[in-house]
Amino acid sequence: MVVTRIAPSPTGDPHVGTAYIALFNYAWARRNGGRFIVRIEDTDRARYVPGAEERILAALKWLGLSYDEGPDVGGPHGPYRQSERLPLYQKYAEELLKRGWAYRAFETPEELEQIRKEKGGYDGRARNIPPEEAEERARRGEPHVIRLKVPRPGTTEVKDELRGVVVYDNQEIPDVVLLKSDGYPTYHLANVVDDHLMGVTDVIRAEEWLVSTPIHVLLYRAFGWEAPRFYHMPLLRNPDKTKISKRKSHTSLDWYKAEGFLPEALRNYLCLMGFSMPDGREIFTLEEFIQAFTWERVSLGGPVFDLEKLRWMNGKYIREVLSLEEVAERVKPFLREAGLSWESEAYLRRAVELMRPRFDTLKEFPEKARYLFTEDYPVSEKAQRKLEEGLPLLKELYPRLRAQEEWTEAALEALLRGFAAEKGVKLGQVAQPLRAALTGSLETPGLFEILALLGKERALRRLERALA
């Protein structure tokens, strides 16, 4: 059975890069009827942020990436937080010492700094401490770490399913720390032990981990375990081709949610970052992605995360993929956040229908449609000028509107066209000042539709205010 996992660190906001990698892990597991695990790598206590784990899990659920095992859903391989698995790592580090694949190193931070300055990195000097002496010093409580003893000379072969075989000279592989002096493991030890114990068959992660993979391959060899298949995905990039980072881009999934991006659209866009559909189409469901998924269609070029392209896709989902009822339902939290209410479900649906071609994110709806929900809306300078130009015509139009009994789009259009013809002016010379009076803007849906939606009483009240 295919078993995949993601192992985010709770060190900040849920990252768009985590979602991208999660998506491919999820798809590969589902494509093969396998299992998808979420494990929390919280061993870096200095960078740990309270509440970050909950936000990561909530973001995955928001994106529709359900997992079979994890810290909040449990499973047969728990616990799923590395901080709750410390005795395991200590046990396996001891195992490596016994097998001659690791050694204790007692250098102080100051000594290590000096070694780095002189040698450019750790030189393995603690390898020469006789094991009995090292054990005695450890028993006395002398602070130390446990390091991997890389076999030298020699080579280590890494097979990446996307990139082929890479052979590393063991002289280039450092004796990395496996267990820190506080008893916490480093990424290398914890990730290999957990992947093995959790039955992970396919490790799908970002390409920045490729350089660490020879260390992991050596650890599998040291324990006598079969290594999983490795796939290193290209990193998401900024438009300037640098690695995506919060300095240059919005990387927090919480930001996309708050800005009114749809989870379906963001998910679809992230699929396109590393994958192309056989028929070349850009809009597809998660289920369609899973059905079409093969590694042959995964690109290794550095995918550029372009916010404008995502906005375009989000707009396509609002206009063409979701039903009118779904869009109306999803704008509600954004209306409430803007302090706006709606008089009925039918009114809200019609407002969304009119505005649908004009907003690309859910958050833009209350910004652009404010005048449909409140009397407290801004008036643009252009609209104010147009209103002032058209006041004489509006004064004459007002009694006609007041006397109009049939308040429908067709009847109102007939009235306004007839009025413009009678006055010998173009329709726009009447319609634009009236639009400004009713909405505070010159960029709105059709005027007759707005008049009909606002209703006679509210439309007349706004016109009276403009004429006062």
Curated annotation (Swiss-Prot):
The gene is gltX. The lineage of its organism: Bacteria, Thermotogati, Deinococcota, Deinococci, Thermales. Residues 432-447 are annotated as: Interaction with tRNA. The record marks 358 as: Essential for discrimination between tRNA(Glu) and tRNA(Gln). Belongs to the class-I aminoacyl-tRNA synthetase family. Glutamate--tRNA ligase type 1 subfamily. ATP binds at residues 15, 208, 236, 243-247. It catalyses: tRNA(Glu) + L-glutamate + ATP = L-glutamyl-tRNA(Glu) + AMP + diphosphate. This is Glutamate--tRNA ligase. Catalyzes the attachment of glutamate to tRNA(Glu) in a two-step reaction: glutamate is first activated by ATP to form Glu-AMP and then transferred to the acceptor end of tRNA(Glu). GO terms for biological process: glutamyl-tRNA aminoacylation. A motif ('HIGH' region) lies at residues 8-18.
